[in-house]
């Protein structure tokens, strides 16, 4: 990438969204305006306990989707009922920051989420009390980087968007202005202001 390239969503946040959030919440200091810190994409592969090759598919999918090599997560404790031993690989995780984070969010919101069949919006009740938002996707095929013909099996993933918001209301306002398609109480998608 060239040095003067700025991701589209990052530029939109800096030029438009920050001013609207400052006006909406009457912040005295620009450092109080909520922003996105990082995005964590986690793919749990419980079957990897029985077949260690399963984790390779998850690593390949996450690498293609995020453009970054994932960290393999291992079991911390042995659980006999799940035939799980300590140190076995059970998932993969990627933490995105900076321009890669903005590019991933842009692709997620403009390309991936609209490709989900019968998509009616994301629930706005999945905030953690500190303005961070977590949601799950049931399979990885909505990302255009994944070739459906070469995919070995569908895998779900959890995506956590970590913000600097102090409460859920600020986090919800930030993500709605970034373009997250939240459902309202009637189950219809809300429009961004």
UniProtKB/Swiss-Prot annotation:
GO terms for cellular component: ribonucleoprotein complex; ribosome. One of its GO terms (molecular function) is structural constituent of ribosome. Keywords: Ribonucleoprotein, Ribosomal protein, RNA-binding, rRNA-binding, tRNA-binding. The keyword Ribonucleoprotein applies. InterPro entries: Ribosomal_uL5, Ribosomal_uL5_bac-type, Ribosomal_uL5_C, Ribosomal_uL5_dom_sf, Ribosomal_uL5_N. SUPFAM superfamilies: RL5-like. One of its GO terms (biological process) is translation. It holds the Pfam family Ribosomal_L5. Belongs to the universal ribosomal protein uL5 family. HAMAP family: Ribosomal_uL5_B. Part of the 50S ribosomal subunit; part of the 5S rRNA/L5/L18/L25 subcomplex. Contacts the 5S rRNA and the P site tRNA. Forms a bridge to the 30S subunit in the 70S ribosome. This is one of the proteins that bind and probably mediate the attachment of the 5S RNA into the large ribosomal subunit, where it forms part of the central protuberance. In the 70S ribosome it contacts protein S13 of the 30S subunit (bridge B1b), connecting the 2 subunits; this bridge is implicated in subunit movement. Contacts the P site tRNA; the 5S rRNA and some of its associated proteins might help stabilize positioning of ribosome-bound tRNAs. This is Large ribosomal subunit protein uL5.
């Amino acid at each position: 990438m060239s040095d003067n390239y700025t991701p589209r969503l990052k530029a939109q946040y800096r030029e438009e969204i920050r001013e609207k959030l400052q006006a909406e919440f009457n912040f005295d200091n620009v450092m109080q305006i909520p922003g996105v810190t990082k995005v964590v994409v986690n793919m749990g592969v419980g079957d990897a306990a029985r077949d260690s090759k399963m984790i390779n598919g998850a690593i390949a999918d996450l690498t293609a989707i995020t453009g970054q090599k994932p960290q393999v997560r291992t079991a911390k404790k042995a659980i006999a009922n799940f035939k799980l031993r300590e140190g076995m690989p059970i998932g993969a995780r990627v933490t995105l920051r900076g321009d890669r984070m903005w590019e991933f969010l842009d692709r997620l919101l403009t390309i991936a989420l609209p490709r989900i069949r019968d998509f009616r919006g994301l629930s706005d009740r999945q905030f953690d009390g500190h303005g961070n938002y977590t949601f799950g996707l049931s399979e990885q095929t909505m990302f255009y980087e994944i070739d459906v013909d070469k995919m070995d099996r569908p895998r779900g993933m959890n995506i956590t968007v970590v913000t600097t918001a102090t409460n859920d209301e600020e986090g919800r306002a930030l993500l709605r202005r970034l373009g997250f398609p939240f459902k309202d109480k009637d189950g219809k998608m809300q429009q961004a202001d």
